[in-house]
Amino acid sequence: MRDFRWLVLIDSESPHWFRAKLAELSLGSYEVVEVEGAFDALAAGRIVRERLATPFVLTTRVDNDDAVARDFVETIQRAAVSPEQRFINLVDGAQLGPKGVYQRPYTQNPFITLVEGARNQLPATVFVKRHFEASKYAPVLNLRSSHPMWLQVVHGGNVLTELVGLRMKARRLTPWFGCEIPCGDGPFEFALDFTLGAARIAGRLVGGPHRLVELGRALAARPAQRL
């Protein structure tokens, strides 16, 4: 992994205990950036521009309750072979719900990356469009991988995220994520949840043809390792 900076964006009015916790966890691995007022793509562009020393830049968004795989950044950097403006989307991910882990291939997932030239201009950054509208701004390169590249946590406080994946064994994530996966995979409970999940997905596909098109795009994505 090369030329990578992890920026943790926080509200300028964040409490002292929160700042202290971030400083304790950092160990030099990320930079905390205070944001005053409303945050948008313009604010993100200014933040990135102040730290930029290269002719092009890649920006990826990750929510603070989600995670990316150990090789996520390296995979994205390998795929960005030119400064041509486009989004790179690693299709294969997973969701963590109250009962377990669920496989979730999704070509419009929130973990998308924008590649763009930034020599004499303010970077647009990945925040220029919402992730499900990315193709309206620039071409999208969808790539598949042999393991989940991102982990989305589905919980009661996240009203915009729906648990729609197919149950998978939590141990498949262990080598790729540096976080504890708090769930068990008992045979009966796993089989029941897998069956119910498959039925739920089938119902969604029948009830929404656009979801079938989305699944087809995900399955047809190019393998990242062949680039």
Residue positions per predicted region:
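Short catalytic/ligand-binding loop motif for oxyanion handling, primarily in non-cytosolic enzymes
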Residues: 14-18, 96-98, 159-162
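A structural signal for short, well-ordered beta-strand segments and their strand-loop junctions
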Residues: 5-9, 87-90
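C-terminal catalytic/acceptor-binding lobe
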Residues: 109-227
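Conserved catalytic core of nucleotide-sugar-dependent glycosyltransferases
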Residues: 39-52, 60, 67-141
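Short loop->beta transition adjacent to catalytic acidic/histidine clusters or analogous donor-positioning motifs
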Residues: 1-7, 28-31
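Extended hydrophobic secondary-structure segments that form protein cores and membrane-embedded regions
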Residues: 6-10, 59-63
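Conserved beta-strand scaffold positions in the cores of enzyme catalytic domains, especially
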Residues: 32-34, 59, 87, 140-143, ...
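Active-site-proximal specificity loops/subdomain of glycosyltransferases
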Residues: 11-58
